[in-house]
């Protein structure tokens, strides 16, 4: 079983079409990985699907980096 961090990074690579080595925990979706607003919405939807959870819009707006996505999933998803 992959770790949450590995699963989140895999989703980011697939959704944003970036290289795996570019997806560091400190990477910002917009500033570092070139995501636009539609990309970030699709990314949140992919996270919801992967981790079988719902991320409210007000929470989704706060998830702007890889680490924030990992932290959110760890805090809100039962493993």
UniProtKB/Swiss-Prot annotation:
Keywords, comma-separated and alphabetical: Cytoplasm, Fatty acid biosynthesis, Fatty acid metabolism, Lipid biosynthesis, Lipid metabolism, Phosphopantetheine, Phosphoprotein
Subcellular location: Cytoplasm
Pathway: Lipid metabolism; fatty acid biosynthesis
GO biological process, one term: lipid A biosynthetic process
Matches recorded under InterPro entries: ACP, ACP-like_sf, PP-bd_ACP, Ppantetheine_attach_site
Family: Belongs to the acyl carrier protein (ACP) family.
Protein name: Acyl carrier protein
Organism taxonomic ancestry: Bacteria, Pseudomonadati, Pseudomonadota, Gammaproteobacteria, Lysobacterales
Gene, per the UniProt record: acpP
């Amino acid at each position: 079983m992959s770790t949450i961090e590995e699963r989140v990074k895999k989703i980011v690579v697939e959704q944003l079409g970036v290289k795996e080595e570019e997806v560091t925990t400190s990477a910002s979706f917009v500033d570092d990985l070139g995501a636009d607003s539609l990309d970030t919405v699709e990314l949140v939807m992919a996270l919801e699907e992967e981790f079988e959870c719902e991320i409210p819009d007000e929470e989704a707006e706060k998830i702007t980096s890889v680490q924030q996505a990992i932290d959110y999933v760890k805090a809100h998803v039962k493993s």
